């Protein structure tokens, strides 16, 4: 996010229950949990690529509590008749944002980092610190703090906290920000800041924990002005593409789970705030 002309506050208590700093129950080790959820995330990433869904994005600037600018776009993520992934914009009124400009990094963050995945392919890029155990709604979770080991020029990373379900070993919630945050007092037009965000996931088809809701409400400190930003991103209408499609991981076909019925609620998950 660029204006016209740090580590997030991880102590922020966003879990339902108190944080228990004790180690996992033996014989399970922290490293085993990390390897399990990284493998599950790779499986999840492959599976989500076989689903259609609707993505509803709102990016707002606020003056006090009054919205004074908004970018809003609704997109259906589909497959064409040849099975290629496509995005079809179904609603996109004229943006009224004036105090910030949406950059390509913002669009990339919305697409790739708000629904953050940390697979076994990316795990070596990050420092992963076990924090403890915490109840998240009806779920027992392991909590980890995540930060990139190094910042490679031109690359973007997630930095923050994740909650991993202690039964399925899948990430069920993330809280953090995209880094690096680019400040440039001499050339404000080159600044690129983004807000801290929370993404909640819910179980789809009785198997995979897919992102369903992201919210951010944060003040960005540009060189020339402080701008309060709000993001609201909804992911809805998940449907498995094609009855004959197969999802394979390490040579094995993954289970399809139970097919979700239209209007059926997800079968479990963390609870986003009331809208």
Locate the predicted segments by residue.
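Structured extracytoplasmic
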Residues: 12-159, 166-173, 177-195, 203-206, ...
